[in-house]
C-alpha cells in the first residue's frame, strides 16, 4: 500500500500546473487515506486562506471510497479466481496437501517468528488496570503532550501524536488499540468528521461546480499512477500477483473495515464450500486489511503537506 501511496503523491504532484499547488497538496493526503489526514488538511487550508482547497479535501474524502471500491473489489476477485483455480486443480490431482503446504510455508515461518519474539508488555500484565476511563485519560494526556511538543518544535501535532502513540505502544506502556479499549473510537471519529464539515460552509454552488475539474483530475491521475506503480513497474512482485498488488494500491482510499468487507464478499462469491472460503480468506484478507491500515501513514504526509500550503 505504501507504494500505492507514493504513486498518488508523485502523480497528483504533477497536476500542480493544472489544478494549482494548494488544490494538489490538499488532496494528496486525503487520497492517501485516514480521516485525521482530512481534518489536518481542511484545517490547514482554511487557516492559509484557501477555502476551495479545504472544500476539495472534504469532498475528496467523501468520494474516495466510491472510486477505490470497484478497483479493489475487481482486482481482488481476479486474484481469488486465480487462487481457487490452482486450489481446485491441486485437489483434483490429489496434490492438495503439497499445494497447501507450499502456500502456507512463508506465513507459518512469519507466525512462528512472531510467536518466538513475543513478550508480555506492561499493558498486558496489568490489563485490568486499563479501564475505559484510564484509557481515555491516557489518550487525552497523549493529545495534550503532542500539542505542547508541536508548539515547542513547530512540528504538526498529528505527526507527533502518531509517533508518541507508536513509541508508547511498542514500549508496552499503553495497550494496543487504545481508543477501542476505551470504547471511544466511534465518538472520536464523529468529532473528527464534524471538524471537516465547516470546510464546506464558506463556498457557493458555483464554487462546487468549479471543484469538479480538480476532483476528476485528482482521481483520474491517482488511478493511473497506481496502475503504473503496482502493475507496470516490478513493485507487484512484492505481493507475487499483479491483480492483488493493484487492488492493495487502492486500500489507501478505503481503510478498515471496508477492506475487510471486500475480502469477505470476494471470498463468498468465489468459494463453493467452507474449505475454499477458509483458504481464500487466509490469502486475500491479510493483504487487503493490512494495506488499509498502512494508510494511517497519511497522517505523516498530511503533516508535511500542511506545512507547504
Please describe what each predicted stretch is.
Residues 21-30, 153-164, 186-191, 212-222:
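Structural signature of hydrophobic alpha-helical transmembrane segments
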Residues 69-73, 168-181, 230-237:
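C-terminal ends of transmembrane helices
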Residues 1-11, 60, 134-136, 186-190, ...:
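Entry/N-cap segments of selected transmembrane alpha helices
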Residues 74-132, 267-285:
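Intrinsically disordered, low-complexity non-transmembrane regions of multi-pass membrane transporters
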Residues 1-9, 26-37, 91, 168, ...:
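Small-residue-rich segments of transmembrane alpha-helices in multi-pass membrane proteins
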Residues 113-186, 199-201:
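Structural signature of multi-pass alpha-helical membrane transport proteins
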Residues 2-43, 52-89, 96-98:
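Transmembrane-helix bundle segments that line or gate the permeation/cavity pathway
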Residues 16-52, 63, 71, 241-296:
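Alpha-helical membrane segments and immediately flanking helix-loop junctions
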Amino acid at each position: 500500500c505504501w507504494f500505492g501511496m507514493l504513486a498518488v503523491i508523485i502523480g497528483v504532484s504533477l497536476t500542480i500546473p493544472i489544478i494549482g499547488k494548494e488544490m494538489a497538496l490538499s488532496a494528496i493526503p486525503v487520497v492517501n487515506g485516514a480521516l485525521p489526514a482530512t481534518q489536518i488538511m481542511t484545517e490547514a487550508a482554511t487557516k492559509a486562506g484557501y477555502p476551495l482547497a479545504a472544500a476539495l479535501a472534504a469532498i475528496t474524502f467523501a468520494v474516495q471510497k466510491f472510486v477505490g471500491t470497484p478497483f479493489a473489489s475487481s482486482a481482488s476477485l481476479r486474484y481469488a479466481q486465480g487462487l481457487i483455480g490452482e486450489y481446485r486443480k491441486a485437489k483434483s490431482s490429489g496434490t492438495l496437501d503439497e499445494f497447501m503446504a507450499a502456500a502456507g510455508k512463508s506465513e507459518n515461518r512469519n507466525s512462528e517468528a512472531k510467536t518466538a519474539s513475543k513478550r508480555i508488555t506492561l499493558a498486558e500484565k496489568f490489563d485490568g488496570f486499563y479501564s475505559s476511563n484510564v484509557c481515555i485519560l491516557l489518550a487525552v494526556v497523549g493529545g495534550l503532550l503532542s500539542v505542547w511538543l508541536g508548539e515547542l518544535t513547530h512540528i504538526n501535532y498529528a505527526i507527533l501524536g502518531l509517533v508518541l502513540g507508536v513509541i508508547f505502544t511498542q514500549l508496552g506502556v499503553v495497550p494496543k488499540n487504545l481508543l477501542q479499549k476505551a470504547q471511544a473510537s466511534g465518538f472520536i471519529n464523529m468529532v473528527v468528521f464534524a471538524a471537516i464539515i465547516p470546510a464546506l460552509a464558506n463556498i457557493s454552488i458555483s464554487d462546487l461546480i468549479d471543484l469538479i475539474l480538480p476532483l476528476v483530475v485528482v482521481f483520474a491521475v491517482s488511478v493511473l499512477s497506481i496502475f503504473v506503480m503496482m502493475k507496470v513497474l516490478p513493485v507487484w512482485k512484492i505481493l507475487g500477483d499483479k491483480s492483488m498488488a493493484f487492488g492493495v494500491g487502492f486500500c489507501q482510499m478505503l481503510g478498515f473495515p471496508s477492506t475487510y468487507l471486500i475480502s469477505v464478499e470476494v471470498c463468498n462469491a468465489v468459494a463453493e464450500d467452507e474449505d475454499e472460503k477458509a483458504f481464500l480468506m487466509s490469502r486475500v484478507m491479510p493483504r487487503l486489511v493490512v494495506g488499509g491500515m498502512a494508510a494511517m501513514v497519511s497522517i505523516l504526509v498530511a503533516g508535511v503537506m500542511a506545512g507547504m500550503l
